[in-house]
């Protein structure tokens, strides 16, 4: 094989860190490693875990995989130069992350939603649509417009914060979308540790769980419908842990999205699930190396 055919992709989310060698021509993940994020330990501890994963992947790599390059996607604001500009979840804003990882190999840093969107554009559900809006629903909520196969970052890298959209529901004070419709939000509203527990309860007919999932999907759909009105995409691709679910949450999301789109023509746009699953983030992070370091 020739050089520059593989890269290490790392996807840092609020719940887990996934890493692996990625074949850049096919998107296949050749090796896969994972650990819990445990962001409450502090940014340095998370960075130490990432360094450990990278070193393990390098030591176990196939002989033909050379040179080493690292692409990292993180659930924070990342500017156009690859600097982490927020510390909402992972406290890396004031850490020299690229310098530390750069001592191992050339490194690029991208927002996780843009990395996921890039992967879906290249190898997943976005291949047939241009432009498309990618919506990630996991521990948090974010979005990205992809046009010509390229995720739109905005002038400063901040064009992703769908989570901050204001939401109003009867009998409650206004709040932001992520506090109501994300995986973390639905678990808190139901008083459990994970969103999966809410889905499990809903599957057993628990009326509170059903109401929480339906209202969350409806709230998110109102925001996604607004995006469709503003951007007029060819399709909406939905990824992340909650984005892969079926049932009442998905049904409410799709129904509410279409109900909040003004144009009758746009109301018919495809709303599809992402194809790459939990590997999308690390695949896209690896692909981002080609855009930032070559």
Where are the model-predicted features located?
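Short, small/polar residue-rich loop motifs at catalytic or cofactor-binding pockets
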Residues: 15-16, 138-140
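Short hydrophobic alpha-helix segments
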Residues: 32-35, 88, 155
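A charged helix-plus-loop insertion that forms the helical arch/lid used to bind
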Residues: 83-93
């Amino acid at each position: 094989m020739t050089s520059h055919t593989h890269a290490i992709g790392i996807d840092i989310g609020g719940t887990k860190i996934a890493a692996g060698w990625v074949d850049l021509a096919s998107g296949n993940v050749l090796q896969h490693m994972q650990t819990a994020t445990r962001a409450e330990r502090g940014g340095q501890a998370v960075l130490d875990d990432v360094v450990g994963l990278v070193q393990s992947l390098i030591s176990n790599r196939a002989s033909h995989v050379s040179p080493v390059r690292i692409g990292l996607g993180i659930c924070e604001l990342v500017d156009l130069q690859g600097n982490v500009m927020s510390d909402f979840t992972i406290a890396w804003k004031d850490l020299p992350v690229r310098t530390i990882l750069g001592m191992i190999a050339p490194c690029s840093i991208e927002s996780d939603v843009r990395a996921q969107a890039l992967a879906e554009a290249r190898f997943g559900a976005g291949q047939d649509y241009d432009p498309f809006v990618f919506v990630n629903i996991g521990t948090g909520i974010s979005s990205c417009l992809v046009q010509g196969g390229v995720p739109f970052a905005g002038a400063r890298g901040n064009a992703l914060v769908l989570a901050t959209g204001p939401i109003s529901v009867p009998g409650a004070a206004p709040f932001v979308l992520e506090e109501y419709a994300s995986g973390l939000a639905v678990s808190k509203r139901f008083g459990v540790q994970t969103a999966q527990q809410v889905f499990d309860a809903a599957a057993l007919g628990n009326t509170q769980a059903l109401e929480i999932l339906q209202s969350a999907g409806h709230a998110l759909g109102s925001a996604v419908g607004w995006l469709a009105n503003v951007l007029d995409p060819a399709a909406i691709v939905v990824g992340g842990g909650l984005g892969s679910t079926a049932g009442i949450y998905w049904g409410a999301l799709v129904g509410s999205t279409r109900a909040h789109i003004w144009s009758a023509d746009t109301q018919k746009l495809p709303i599809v699930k992402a194809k790459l699953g939990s590997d999308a983030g690390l695949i896209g992070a690896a692909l981002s190396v080609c855009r930032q370091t070559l």
